[in-house]
Curated annotation (Swiss-Prot):
Region Legume-lectin like, residue ranges: 24-277
CDD domains assigned to the protein according to its UniProt record, in alphabetical order: lectin_legume_LecRK_Arcelin_ConA (cd06899)
One GO MF term: carbohydrate binding
Record's protein name: Lectin-like protein At1g53080
Xref: Pfam families: Lectin_legB
Signal sequence, renumbered to the chain: 1-23
Length: 283
């Protein structure tokens, strides 16, 4: 009888230990450094007085040319049930407000920011990841499938080496800074002309210093991206909608956050708010 009870107890403990919480949901209305990992030159952004903090997560420092950095959520996040490439990827969605602000004494922008999903926390600062590499990869690692990198870039410098369509675009990247698909930055609004509904595209300038909001969703092997000025609601029509199978890209757990870099064209890259949610269930 005692042995029977012991077996039941061991089984109960085993079941408890195997049950893990996979779903993740968080929201930052502003940043104070809590639950964040800072890599490279990433920091809590300074306020205009130069002493206090603005509440932003900053990827670069406008007084340091060629600076770049990453700001990541502290905990690894489940992205699929196992590392097997056949495992389906959990749906996820994220939204954030950001601004890219050139330094007044040097109005030429460069280079941009990206929402990222990466396999590890890269504590070793890579000096070669600056400029058009957006703090993500370097000339040697760009395009390597072992990067296990997913990113949506907001690029304000046309680097023809990477096939950039212009100096003001949004792109979806897999293991590389060469975008799988990209569109000029802007948003769609629906208008009515002569009794007919029509879509009108309104371009925005990412490096204007204005606040913009982005929404990114992944579901059923499809990436969907919306962009609009921060004071507007999410547009009904997305900027980008493309088929992307992340099952061979993401691992069972990944880190998520932002990266950014600049060259001689000094600018600030600030994230002002951020929410993230995946649809994983308890295992």
């Amino acid at each position: 009888m005692q042995i029977h009870k012991l077996c039941i107890f061991v089984l109960f403990i085993s079941l408890l230990s195997s049950k893990t919480i996979s779903a993740v949901k968080f929201n930052f209305n502003r940043f104070d450094g809590t639950n964040l990992i800072f890599i490279g030159y990433a920091e809590l952004g300074p306020a205009t007085d130069g002493m206090s903090r603005s509440g932003a997560l900053s990827m670069t420092r406008d007084n340091i040319p060629f600076s770049h950095g990453q700001g990541l959520y502290t905990d690894p996040i489940p992205f699929k049930s196992s590392n097997n490439t056949s495992s389906s990827v959990y749906s996820f969605k994220t939204s954030f407000t950001f601004s890219i602000t050139p330094r007044r004494s040097n109005p030429n922008p460069g280079h941009g920011i990206a929402f990222i999903v990466v396999p590890t926390v890269a504590y070793e600062y890579d000096q070669d990841s600056t400029r058009g590499f957006l703090g993500l990869v370097n000339l040697t690692t760009n395009g390597n499938p072992n990067n296990h990198l997913f990113a949506v870039e907001f690029d304000v410098f046309q680097d023809k080496r990477f096939g950039d369509i212009n100096d003001n675009h949004v792109g979806v990247n897999i293991n590389s800074v060469n975008s799988k698909v990209s569109e000029k930055a802007g948003y769609w609004i629906q208008t009515r002309t002569r009794g007919k509904n029509q879509w009108l595209f309104k371009e925005v300038k990412l490096s204007s210093g204005d606040n913009y909001k982005a929404w990114i969703e992944y579901k059923n092997s499809k990436v969907i991206v919306w962009l609009a000025p921060a004071h507007l609601k999410k547009p009904k029509r997305p900027l980008i909608e493309t088929q992307v199978d992340l099952s061979e890209v993401v691992l069972e757990t990944m880190y998520t956050g932002f990266s950014g870099s600049m060259g001689r064209g000094v600018e600030r890259h600030d994230i002002w708010s951020w929410s993230f949610e995946n649809t994983a269930k308890n295992n």
